[in-house]
Structure formats: C-alpha cells, structure tokens
Amino acid sequence: MDVGDMGDAGSNGRTSPAGRSLREYRQAPDCRHSDVHSRDTRLIPASPRGMNHEMASAHPTATAPASTQPVNIVPDPTVLASDLGKSFQRSAEEIVPWFVAQMPRMYFEDTSATEVANHLRAIIAARASGQPLHLTLHSDDRRQWTIIREGNKPGVLAEVVRSLPMSPSLRAAKIHGSKDGAIVLDTFEFGERSPFTGTTPEQTEKLKATIAFANSHAKDWTESAIRAYFAGCAADYIATLTPHRLNKHRLLLQSVSGSEGTAVETEPELEGQLTRMTIAFSNARARTMLERCAHVLSRGGINIQRAYLDQVADPPFGSVTMLGFVIQTQDGKSVDTSSAAWKQVAHDLTRIKWIDSESIWLANRHEGMTLDEAELILGLCTLSHQHLVHRDRLLFSIERILATAERTITITRQIADLFRARFNPAAPLDDAHFNKRAAALRADIGTKDDPEGTATILVALLDAVEATFRTNFFLAKRFGLSMRIDPSYLRDDRRPELPYGTFFVIGRGFFGFHNRFKEIARGGLRVVKPSNAAQHSRERERVFDEVYGLSWAQQQKNKDIPEGGAKAAILLEPESDITRCVKSFVDSLLDLITDDPAVRKQVVDRFGSRELIYLGPDENITPDHIEWIVSRARARKYAMPDAFMSSKPGAGINHKVYGVTSEGVNVFLEVALRARGIDPRKQPFTVKITGGPDGDVAGNMIRILDRDYGNNARIVGIADGSGVGEDPDGLDHTELLRLFKEALPIAKFDPKKLGKHGAVVPVEAPGGVMIRNTLHNRLKADAFIPGGGRPATINESNWRDYLTKDGKPSAPIIVEGANLFLTPGARKELFAAGCLIFKDSSANKCGVICSSYEIGASMLLDEKSFMPALKRNC
C-alpha cells in the first residue's frame, strides 16, 4: 500500500509545487463535518492516469500555430467529475480489501460502522490525492479526535499524544495498528464521559453477566460491590470489556486504591506473538500517563499494537486511570517478562508518574542512561545550584550547571555512579573505597580548565554526593528523590548559622527543602507556586534561602516552647499540580524517617541516628493535605503519625478554624494603636492588609477586627494573589466576612458593596499586577498587617517606596503576621523613619505555641480521648 512518507508539521496556506494550497488537498469527500489535516507539506504528484488528457492537449505547444481564437482552458465539469470519481474508485478498490484484512478484529468491535466508513473515506481521499497518510479528524464538537499515521514503530504513539490538547481532559483512548505495521489509527475522546446507569437493555445484560461471572469465578466480588464499581465507570468502558477483564481491572484498582501508586500486570495475549499489559495509576492525568507510558515502551524498543485508556472512580480517594496495551518486540515476538530489559521497562512504568520531564529528556539525549540515573543527575545539579548561587548567580545559573553536566557527561555519570555505589543496599561502598574513588574524580576534575566554572560545578556535584547521609534512591516505588544531607554543604556567609539537619527532595515539577535548627524542631510546610516562568526563575535562586530564613525565624519564635525552629518549602513549576507535589514531597521525606523495616533495608544510613520531623500547615496547604499527610504517615509506619502534622481538621487545633495566629497578631495591634494614641475600641482607625480573606492569617484578622472593634476598624485595602480591593471609607465588613466564610479571594468582592471611591481590581485587569504589588506602599493607613506575601517583599533596595512624599511611613505601625515580609535591613530603616514594627517572631508566634500543645497532646492521647478535651477547652 503506497501511503507516502510521514512529515513534519506544516501550516495552511502554503503552496505545493503545482501551485495549489494544502487547504485544497485537505478536502475529503463526505468528511465535511471533520477537520482533516495533513502535517506534511510534500505532496506526491498525481499519476498520469489521473490527469485529464483533454485538458493537457488544450494547451498550445511551442510549435503549434498561433490561433486568433481564445483558448478555452476551463475544464468540462462532467469529465472532471468522472476522472475524480475513477481516481477515488481505484483507490477504494485497492484500500478497502487491504484495510478489512489488516486491521485487527478489536478495531471493528470498538468502532461503529459510521466511524469505520469515515476513516476509510479519509484514507482513500489522501491516497487519491497523492498525500502522505498523516491525518487528524475532529468531530463537530471537537470532543473526539482520530489521528491516522503511516507506520507503526516505537515512539509513534508518544508523538501523537504529545500533539493532543491539554484541555478538556482526555477521558478515553483506543489505539489500533494494522497487522502489517503500515498504519496506526488512534481515537481519543475528551470531556465528560457518559456514565454507566444500568438503564439500557445492553447495560442491564452486562451487569447480569458480570454478576453471574463473579458467582462462579470471583466470589469475593459481591453484587453490591459490582454495582458500586460499575457506577464509577463510563458506559462505553463497561460495554467494551468482558466480565473477566472487568474483574482483572477491579483487582488492579484495589491494589492502588488510596495509595497514589501504580500497578503493572502482564499476561500472554491469545492471538499471535503478543503480550497484554495493564497499568493502573491512582490519581493521574490520563493524557500525561498515556504519553509517558508510550514513551517508556518506545525507550524499551516495544511496539504498541493496540492500546486503551479509561478512568474509573475510586471514592473517596479520587480516580484510577486504566491503561491497557497489547505489545510485542520490534522483531514481532511476545515480550519476555523475565528479561532484565523488560524488568527495567516495568520499573520505569511503575515510577513514570513521579519522574520529572527534564529527567526524561536528559535520559533520551544520552544512550544507555536510565531514567533513575537522569533523575539523580538532575537532583545533584539542582542541589548544587543552591550551593553555588551566592558565588555568582549568572555564572552558576541552573541552566549553566545543567549544560556543564551534559557537556562533561562522562565524568558527571561517574559522579552519579559513585553516589549509587555508596548507597547501594546490596553492597554499599565503604568509606575507604569511596574516598579513593572520590579522590580520583577530584584529580580528573582538577585537570580541566575553568574559565566558565566547569571544575567548580563538577566539584560541587561531587561534594553533594559526599554531603549525603541517606537517600531513598533504591526504593522501587518512591514518589520522588530525597536526600538527608549535611547542612554544612549549604552554609555560606548569607547562611551563617549551622542547622541541625537538612532534607532535599526533588520530583516531578518541583523541588524543596526541610531544614531544622534542633533535633526536635517544629515549623510549617509551604508551597510556592509562581504564576509564570520568569517568576519561577527568580524563586528557584532563593529556595533554600527562604527555608533557611523561615526556619531561623521559627527558631527565634520558638524560644518559649520545647521545640526548635524548622521550615519546609516546595517550589513548583508554574503548571504543576499542588496536591501531587505535596504528596511527592511528604512521601519522599517519610522514606528517610519511617521505621518500616522493609524500607529501612533499602536505605543505607550514614547519619546513624533516628530522626523525627514535625510539620505544620503554611501557604497553600489545605485541610485535605493535612489529613492525607497524617494518614500517609500512619500507612508508612512512621513512629508518631498523629504528631507528624499539626493543625489537623479532626483531632487537632486547626489554625484557620480557631484563628490562633491572628489572635496573637491582634493583641500586638491593639497595643501598638494605644501606644500611638488610638483606643481601637472607642476610636476609628484604618488598616491595610496583604493576604486574602480566604487565607488563615488575613482572613481571621478580618473576622477578629470586626468582632473586637466593629466599624471602628476601617479596612482600606486588601491585596492577595487574585488582586486588590480598596476603599478609603473602609471595605464593607459584611461582604469581607462572606468571602472569609466561603474561602474566596478579594477579587470576588461584590463591587456593589463598594463606596463611591472604592474599587476592586483583579490581577487580570490592565495594570492589575502592579496595582496589587504596590498596595502595601501606596495606601495610607494607621496600621499595616502583612498577613501574606513573599519573603523580602520590603527589602534594603525598596524600603523607601513605603514612605510618603514627606518621608513618613505610609502606615506608622507594622504588625508582621507573615514571616520575613521585611528584611532585617529594611526593618531598621523603617524604624529609623518612625515606624513602630512588631517583628514576625513575636507577633505571629501564637500559632506555633498552639501547635506545640496540640502535638504534645497527640503524643499522649488517641483521637477518642483528644476530641472531648478539645471540645471542653476550645
């Protein structure tokens, strides 16, 4: 079958050598309701038998006598239609028998007769017009895409899926390759699925058949459980699978339910030299997992003959994505699942949900590099960046570090290999042999010229290996890569105090640190989510600076409680999912501190001491995250799971519910106002706030200001991630309290509730970002409460912006509800300018004091005993 060559992406409006645009070639008969696209700009010329010879002879030749009559070059429409019909007929006579013979039986079972006819029309149209077979068909509502490509080889499916839209969500996929490998035909469905309801005769029959099957072959699968499973499935998913296959999927779902994990199962396929593989992913984006699995199979030299994708509900945990593949080796044989090559593929499939895209592309660029090795190299480079950034932020940017690691890939891989050897639980490298190999690497690095910092970067990578005490690298089902490192590795002039312990974690779309200044220390976990790449680039230079600064501030704040100071922060890439990254970070941390014997066997410990970590909620951590963290710690056999996380919604003292941090901030605010001659319970005063009504500190501050001072408290401005609300007469309290109760940001403030000089400006509005970012400087007020915002928002270089034209503070009182909003230098300058400032380590310490009591109680009481005590005292 001559279907031409596959090509690269083209664009409409280009012209073929014959002078016709590609748009003309893309019109397929009877496909008016589908968009048919060919991405190849090279067109195979029409064969001579397809030309209109009368038209050709109508053109004068060089020797023909001149004619005084005008030449009629308009073709006869009847003849032209006849020629085209014959061309399509010949193509149909060649293609249809081949198509029916070569497409697998399952294609015809999965595809309606109408869709089969549409697929054939598109293929015939491409063949008749001499196009390469590289087509995309869309349904009218664009909820179904069919992509037809020439040739079926490893990597084709991954390339196809990569071209699909990210929105709406992919809900189902069916992939079919012809038996001779000539074409692959992929159908993708997007948007909301049609659920199984059991109301049609076909659905009722399938339900009965499955119940009957279970009575004979799966007695643990009760009728009520079958009905519950079916209720979480799409109707076409149930219709497609046999009861036997549905039961297998049910068992796979159970194996990953609530775990965030992955299960891979293989079995021989009945027809030919094929292997069936089914993968279940807990709470994973369907499109991404299909692309990543196809990529892993391509790396392993595995051909995909058929593939299926569906999602099944997994209440209350979310959903499970089911991927089915019918595969074979490149030489047309079934897969040897006992081979080392396949075991590597299966391992990669198990972990692919959690591997960063950068690691995938790094492995692709270097033959023989595994995904685990690439992940390790990326991790060492990221950690080294935090080590080097203060020396020269441009010379040692993350981009230059990664480029250097790749440019000297041989020695980089030797460093990674040394890491693996040192922590290989089967035979860990002893100190003597490690030091010998490290010295040899240092000698090799020392011979390199260093005009661009090459040697410095490579030494930093090697130093990172030496600084690692513990890693989860060899855990087969880890959610990320974690290392317990010597904190002296990150010590420099800007971080002079030596912490007790530092953990580094990197995963898909994020990296972060946990840092503590005492063996037993407490501090929150925050998520930093930049809105764009430029902001992410700035934030990644200071991730450990932020963690260090916050944990040191916490150390000062905790002087009145037994625990020292700690903090954890995760920096997300702009498009990363917060919940996935939080789970990856926390689970990777648990890998290094759990008492589970099965885990400890795989973790070589060069620190030599058991460690306990105590977390609390901070920015972007929700009650659902808190509950998951505690339950996950329990499932992972952490020594004190109830004490692992404070501010628990159930058996805990939830900061947002009780407003414990804001209660303390308010005490300092009242004292400050009285010191300035304002009795807030009798006199009006104005206040501006950063942090939204949906936040813990700012939201509860709004509630407390209204509770204690009523209309005397005039909130003249609020800024949060969504925008600003400003009103010189004071924002309406009732509306602000509505936003607080409904957990809505300030941009949702009802404009009808504004005074005549008030305004709500979302960040999306022209100038909205600038207006939001300057509110704390622009507005005049009696007091300013930073209840949210990034560290160092007011710093040594911009503190003057906080002053009015006459050099006075725009608000003469600052009560720091948010940590590190002001740098020490800025704080000194503003104090000298007449600003009364209550520092974060004093003003907002009520939250951590409360958490200390909560965790102490959690160590002594179970939930049954804790809850009555909470109700009596709170």
What are these regions (language model features)?
Residues 56-60, 64-509, 514, 527-540, ...:
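Non-catalytic interaction/regulatory segments
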Residues 273-275, 523-531, 567, 640-654, ...:
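Gly-rich Lys/Arg/Thr-decorated short loops/hinges at beta-loop-alpha junctions or inter-strand turns
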Residues 372-376, 489, 494-524, 556-580, ...:
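Conserved phosphate/anionic-ligand binding catalytic regions in large, soluble enzymes, centered on
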Residues 401-456, 657-722, 732-760:
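Extended, regular secondary-structure scaffolds
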Residues 547-683, 707:
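Glycine/serine-rich phosphate-binding loop and adjoining beta1-alpha1 elements at the start
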Residues 549, 577-578, 669-688, 705-714, ...:
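Non-transmembrane, aqueous-exposed alpha-helical and coiled segments at domain scale
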